[in-house]
Amino acid sequence: MSRIIVEATTSDCAVTTILGLLRCGFQAKTARISYNLNKCLPPPEEFDKYPLILVGTLKHSSLAVHVYSVTAGYGGTGPHAMVDILEAAGFKFEDSDILTADHADSNGQIDLVYHR
């Protein structure tokens, strides 16, 4: 499986990049969200721990897209960018899953998986 790392400096840049991939034909089938409210973003070199990983296909090839600068668990710009990406990719979910800490465990960890 090929991999694209989206290490944008802002969540808005991440949204723009993902929208471009979607326009080029990327079809996300699975979205994995993993974010810790207490630890915030992982080190940039640990791309397997990025807050959003989209898995799907682009031109009949398997592709994983690791997105760095989006977050979850509160109402800021990072979580709103996550919502924008998930909506654009066609996932069904409740905004409150992303914009609140309702799904955080006692350590502040949020882990969600959506399928299309």
Give the residues covered by each predicted segment.
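Mixed-charge, Lys/Arg-enriched low-complexity segments
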Residues: 83-116
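Extended, alpha-helix-rich binding/interface surfaces that flank or overlap catalytic cores
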Residues: 2-6, 12-22
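Low-complexity, intrinsically disordered regions in eukaryotic regulatory proteins
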Residues: 51-71, 97
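Ser/Thr- (and often Asn-) enriched beta-sheet segments in non-cytosolic proteins
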Residues: 3-5, 30-34, 111
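Hydrophobic, Leu/Ile/Phe/Ala-enriched alpha-helical segments that form helix-helix packing faces
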Residues: 18-25, 85-90
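Amphipathic, interaction-prone secondary-structure segments
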Residues: 21-58
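A short, exposed loop/beta-hairpin motif centered on an aromatic-Gly-Thr core
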Residues: 3-8, 66-75
